[in-house]
Amino acid sequence: KFDTVDIQKYIQYKMLQSEIKFSNARAVGNKNVIPLPHQIEAVYGRMLQVPRVRFLLADDPGAGKTIMAGMLMKELMARYQSERILILVPPLVLRQWQEELEEKFGLHFHIINRNTLREYGRKNPFIENDLVLASMYWAIRDDVKPLIQEADYDLIIVDEAHKMAAYTQGTNKKKVFRTKLYQLGEAILRKAEHVLLLTATPHKGDTENFRHLMKLIDEDVFTSSVVNE
């Protein structure tokens, strides 16, 4: 008689055995993480198949986006493609992200906040630490945003990425209103080698709003308003 864990392990084994594209997998061997088939396919079958990982990961709440983000981080680090990582999340889930990444992947992320700034004095904590977690709303402050811009990151992950919103206004579709979060995205995401945006609500019925979000991933492809969905 098999339980759920046995079935998941068997599916994982068969996928890894039958697909050569999964042959270099590192994160799935972690005893603390038993990824589901859709998580394996997303990370190994899609994201890691391109030299620059720049993806919008849209999935239902509870589908394990944090797990997929952790798997991606472990793989990129194991392949020496990412050393410095920044994760921006809503403030209420900062500790949850930190604890889950520590427990499941052995990754210790430093939470940077106003107390951290005081502790570091004249030093920039975003430069001094390689693995950083910060509140996305705190990051847009005028005294914080420049500190993030000074630090170069190999991989930037944004949870609730749809909050980095921009809107085309007017009938001529030439005036664009950019929220402060979107302006932060423009400032830091385009210079990062790898970007992963996480959201459960990527498209809210506004095609232009969605196009602006995708521009943060690939400005060349999504610059023109004639790009169709």
Provide a role label for each language-model segment.
Residues 2-7, 11-47, 63-190, 221-229:
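SF2 helicase/translocase NTPase motor core
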Residues 210-223:
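A short helix-turn-beta junction within AAA+ P-loop NTPase domains corresponding to the substrate/partner-engaging
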Residues 57, 62, 161, 210:
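Conserved S/T- and glycine-rich ATP-binding loop of Class I adenylate-forming
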Residues 54-58, 86, 196:
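Short hydrophobic/aromatic beta-strand immediately N-terminal to the Walker A/P-loop
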Residues 60, 90, 201:
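P-loop (Walker A) phosphate-binding loop of NTP-binding proteins
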